[in-house]
A protein has these predicted regions:
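Acidic, surface-exposed loops and disordered segments
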Residues: 1-98
Length: 98
């Protein structure tokens, strides 16, 4: 399943992008509680998206979410793998830069 999140023109009111992001995040959290995974996507070919979905020109599509079940259910509850992330101390600055 895919959900397209439409907003008024984000160039006129920037907070619409924040609101769209919040909506996306809460949909993802709600889905996760039901055992459904999700993946957000940013869209860059706006005219193609409008042609495919047929939404009015005064609305803008910037975020799409795909939802589905994992192929292997144990992957949903698997502990996160240790990756090549930087240490917190390397990316966080307290009270001042540096």
């Amino acid at each position: 399943m895919c959900v397209a999140i439409l907003t008024p023109d984000p160039n006129e009111k920037f907070q619409t992008m924040f609101d769209a992001g919040q909506a996306a995040a809460f949909m993802q959290l709600a889905a996760w509680e039901l055992g459904v995974g999700s993946c957000p996507a940013s869209l860059y070919e706006f005219d193609k998206a409008r042609a495919i979905l047929g939404f009015p020109v005064e609305w803008h599509l910037r975020i799409a979410l795909s939802f589905g079940y994992a192929l292997e259910e144990e992957k949903l509850s698997a502990p996160p793998k240790k990756g090549g992330r930087m240490l917190l101390e390397e990316v966080v600055h307290w009270e001042k830069w540096g």
